[in-house]
Amino acid sequence: MSDQAVVTLKDVDVEFHGKTRSVHAVDHVDLTVNRGDIYGIVGYSGAGKSTLVRTINLLQRPTGGSVNVLGQDMLALSPAQLRKERKRIGMIFQHFNLMNSRTIADNVAFPLKGLKSKQAIQKKVAELLDLVGLTDRANSYPAQLSGGQKQRVGIARALASDPEILISDEATSALDPKTTSSILELLQSLNQRLGLTIVLITHQMEAVKQICNRVAVMDDGAIIECGDLLQVFSNPQQQLTKDFIDTTLQLDQAIDAVMQQPTVKNLGPDDRLLRLTYVGDSADQPLVAKLFSSYHVTANILFGDIQILQDTPFGNLIVVLSGDHDEVESGIAYLKQQDVKIEDILKKEA
């Protein structure tokens, strides 16, 4: 990753006007994507994600604002200049859009027709199929491929013009979880091997968690939160972001299950049911042991989860802290000093 911006959207607005009403699909959005980013844009259906990213290559012209891509003011380009610039921006979709009557090699070669010699095209197609792991499928037809393999063909075709940016518009939405994971791993590999900047549109925070380094959350046409992946996951500011993250981490189900446990139903007057979120160095500390040895507070762990985000440990615990009221409060103060984020679950439930 670098600090060089390759996509800069400023105050981008998109409105659709019908006979009876208007729709504000994108509402004055600012977005900066740096070279080498895998930038996830997540939101529910209808949030405006796809409309927003289609302004990057002007498949959707904005009603207002500016679009700068790879140093070019996209809105100032002539049609011929725009066609040239679009070759620097690849795109893959949920639907594969393959030509069923043509072989896989011919599908990948299609964008190159008329631009290279036959021999050069064959060489390029072979390189692309090798890149996406489909060398042995060059002479197959789309009907003979699985959904994941078809998407790999789509990726190879999108890379035919050697783009610097790849837009993935819900490209894994129609795939099963295992295949989704393999496609995401391929995208991450392409990012690392080719220096490819990727903008990933999805309604699945799990996909963002797996490969993105930055994330923006969209709702009702606006970006309501954005930032470094670890920062957003560890300290979400908006309720929608929290909901996405908790669903991905399965914390909602965990809390529902915990609330039914006898330990929780029979809490003492000074007991506290808490969610502890910790990142990085905090994950390496013997926090539970320290609570008991220094504060005489017992921590009953009802749920625990730790994951690695951007090579950094990120964990959540649901615990009952038991002890004297003042000691429990002192223990909580100690946890906060260790940069542990604390959420009182019973207050949240209330």
UniProtKB/Swiss-Prot annotation:
Binding annotation for ATP: 43-50
Database matches in InterPro entries: AAA+_ATPase, ABC_transporter-like_ATP-bd, ABC_transporter-like_CS, ACT-like_dom_sf, MetN_ABC, MetN_ABC_transporter-like, NIL_domain, P-loop_NTPase
A Pfam family: ABC_tran
UniProt subcellular location: Cell membrane
Residue ranges of domain ABC transporter in the record: 9-245
This enzyme's EC code(s): 7.4.2.11
Catalysed reactions, as listed in the record: L-methionine(out) + ATP + H2O = L-methionine(in) + ADP + phosphate + H(+); D-methionine(out) + ATP + H2O = D-methionine(in) + ADP + phosphate + H(+)
Gene3D superfamilies listed in its UniProt record: 3.30.70.260, P-loop containing nucleotide triphosphate hydrolases
Keyword ATP-binding: yes
Keywords, alphabetical: Amino-acid transport, ATP-binding, Cell membrane, Membrane, Nucleotide-binding, Translocase, Transport
The keyword Repeat is assigned to this record: no
A Gene Ontology molecular function term of the record: ATP binding
Main location: membrane
PANTHER family given in the database record: AMINO ACID IMPORT ATP-BINDING PROTEIN, METHIONINE IMPORT ATP-BINDING PROTEIN METN
Summary of the function given for this chain in its UniProt record: Part of the ABC transporter complex MetNIQ involved in methionine import. Responsible for energy coupling to the transport system.
Summary of subunit composition and partner proteins: The complex is composed of two ATP-binding proteins (MetN), two transmembrane proteins (MetI) and a solute-binding protein (MetQ).
Family: Belongs to the ABC transporter superfamily. Methionine importer (TC 3.A.1.24) family.
Name of the molecule in the record: Methionine import ATP-binding protein MetN
Organism expressing this protein natively: Lacticaseibacillus paracasei (strain ATCC 334 / BCRC 17002 / CCUG 31169 / CIP 107868 / KCTC 3260 / NRRL B-441)
